[in-house]
Amino acid sequence: MSQDIFTPTRVTCQVGGKEIIIESGRMANQAHGEVWIQCGGTVVLVTVCSQPLEFDKGFFPLTVEYSEKMYAAGRIPGSFFRREIGRPSERETLVARLIDRPIRPLFPKGLNEDVQVLASVISADQENESDVLALTGASAALMLSPLPFEGPVAGGRIARVGGQFVLNPTFEQQAQSDLNIVFAASGDALTMVEGDARFISEDVIIEALEWGRLQILPLVEIQHKLRELCGKPKMNFTPHQDDEALVACVHELALANGMEEALRVPEKMARKDARKAVKDKVMETLKADPAWAENEAALKAVSDILGGLEKKLVRARIVNEGTRIDGRDTTTVRPIQIQTGLLPRAHGSALFRRGETKSLVVATLGSSTDEQRMDSLTGDVTKRFMLHYNFPPFSVGEVKPVRVSRREIGHGALAEKSLRPVLPADADFPFTLRVVAETMESNGSSSMAAVCGGSLSLMDAGVPVSAPVAGVAMGLIKEGEKFIVLTDILGDEDALGDMDFKIAGTAEGVTGVQMDIKITGLTTEIMRTAMQQAREGRLHILEEMAKAIASPRKELSRYAPQHAEVFVNPDIIRLIIGPGGKNIKAITAATGASVDIEDSGRVSIFAPTAEALEKAREMVSYYDQRPDLGKNYNAKVRKIMEIGAIVEVLPNVEALVHVSQLDVNRVEQPGDVARLGEDMLVKVIEINGDRIRASRKAVLLEEQGHPWNPEDTARPQRSDRGDRGDRRGDRGGRDRRDRGDRR
């Protein structure tokens, strides 16, 4: 009999002053693992399902998906079909990676199961973040499932507000914070770190992570408790063991055919060829040996056995000799070469090379209309700075489908958050910025090359960044109690090592950090050593960057958009826009400029050239002019009255042309001279605050050779018109006092 949905199994704990609830049995009971995790009004449903693989894919097929349901925040999707369709958003992809990275290493090697973890945000209270809940929920669901999982882990977010650490801050607290780090930890060690900071010292980050790890221990404990209450029996899994005789034979053949020498070749592609040559010789020998020739499983296992030997040899050399694959010691950064301004039509460009890793990074400036607009649980969001990281297959000499991968989105996000703290405020530099990092070749740390190249390209474009930013990737080799931290790791060192720790920042402090750890027991001592060594490497890279370009260029590229701001009276905004946007469209058509108007009257103009900018500014300012005393205007008659005519001398600026000023001769009826809707050339003869008087008579006198004298057009007295008699009699008017009973 199925469990009553109203009585799920529940565990709770207090974390960061908030209650977190994890329960199972309410929702997806046919999933192999399922939890509902809640904090405040934010709820995430996480499910786990698995099925045996029909054949060995050569890798562990773990799929993690995170989705934000718009109904969770009481919103309807903005897509044409009004439903969540298409590929995941950038945020959904990044959160899925946050979940994947700490749980993937906790599955045993050789697990022949297709595993899918789905996390869905089904309620969002606009206060409590869902990403860290999803991470913890994924671990809890895996703990309940039959899958072998060496967890649990828990996730948390650390902010620093007013000098005090805050765990799982609200959105408002995050906006006030100078630190924003998401992390995952088991009971005694960190397993994943991702975050950004505003020039925070290494010591503060270490302190924050250690503090945060201790704060989330209750989340680890209640997962064990939930497992005891309702966990499914774990499947029997026996890790694959290679034939000892085969392992010994492969090792002997590899060493005899130059494996150690191949691993000392400093160039990546040459080393790859040398290793392949060793493998080919080993396979050739085994296929000629009757003991192994017909054993397909043994021949298939050779690649993994050789990989294990390579890892053992490289790690032993680093530990025993302090020498790395390319001959460097443990703290040396690879040689750096930089070229800026190499693309003639780009707004800013830089080619950054560090060893065999090279990135072409290009900065583009746009207008406010180029901002990225996104539909999210918190409402419509705009993004003024974007960094896109591309990793084409040719960068590593491979043939693969060309599409944007999750890895590329993740690396771009890390580089973006590392550069964002040095960007000028919107009010000081209102351009939209897009930086694209094209990886030309890669041998490790390409994301950090994107950070360095991004900083250089922004300075080349003339963006007034507050300081240059550099990044470096750190590695770790840990054997027993002995550990060695590696600066500026190669791709092979990333694969063979125990940690990938990327740190970016300025000379003042850290701006971005990302860490993935493959082992348990990452001590504070290791963290401190890695952070200090990374700082030394970062400062060295910043010195090399300063040799190419030390500060932002004083002027923008002549191909960049030109910008100006105009402040107008808010009352005339509707005039500038025009009916149906007619006037704005006319400005754009005439100049190619984009015009953005705020309710405050601030008008931001972006144009392709300086000439177009000036023309657009004049066209906007035309609607906000004030008339000059004594100046002639081709006015339009808007209203005819007994005392004269109301004319529009400028947009939204009206003046009275008194009947005595309509002509050089006496005018009995204003309509005899003024025609509604027609143009009339007039001179402004008086400005008294918002009251303006104009004269057609003064213009006519000037045409007859009589210059205008302000005294000639002084405000008329009633006697100026002479004796007009009884107006009721002469004009046929009626005495308003004798109108009879109008009821």
From Swiss-Prot:
Q: Which residues form the S1 motif domain?
A: 630-704
The KH domain covers: 561-620
Read off the InterPro entries from this record: ExoRNase_PH_dom1, ExoRNase_PH_dom2, ExoRNase_PH_dom2_sf, KH_dom, KH_dom_type_1, KH_dom_type_1_sf, NA-bd_OB-fold, PNPase
Q: Which residues bind Mg(2+)?
A: 494, 500
Record's GO cellular component, any one?
cytosol
Q: Could you tell me where this protein is found in the cell?
A: Cytoplasm
Which residue ranges are recorded for the region named Disordered?
A: 702-743
SUPFAM superfamilies for this protein: Eukaryotic type KH-domain (KH-domain type I), Nucleic acid-binding proteins, Ribonuclease PH domain 2-like, Ribosomal protein S5 domain 2-like
Catalyzes what? RNA(n+1) + phosphate = RNA(n) + a ribonucleoside 5'-diphosphate
Q: How would you classify this enzyme at the top EC level? A: transferase
The prosthetic group or cofactor this protein requires is:
Mg(2+)
Q: Name one GO molecular function term.
A: polyribonucleotide nucleotidyltransferase activity
* Keyword line: Cytoplasm, Magnesium, Metal-binding, Nucleotidyltransferase, RNA-binding, Transferase
Q: Which GO terms describe its biological process?
A: mRNA catabolic process; RNA processing
Bias-annotated ranges (Basic and acidic residues): 712-743
What EC number(s) would the UniProt record show? 2.7.7.8
Any matching Pfam family: RNase_PH
Q: Which Gene3D superfamilies match?
A: GHMP Kinase, N-terminal domain, K Homology domain, type 1, Nucleic acid-binding proteins
Q: Which family does it belong to?
A: Belongs to the polyribonucleotide nucleotidyltransferase family.
Matching HAMAP family: PNPase (MF_01595)
Q: What does this protein do?
A: Involved in mRNA degradation. Catalyzes the phosphorolysis of single-stranded polyribonucleotides processively in the 3'- to 5'-direction.
Protein name stated in the entry: Polyribonucleotide nucleotidyltransferase
Give the originating organism: Desulfovibrio desulfuricans (strain ATCC 27774 / DSM 6949 / MB)
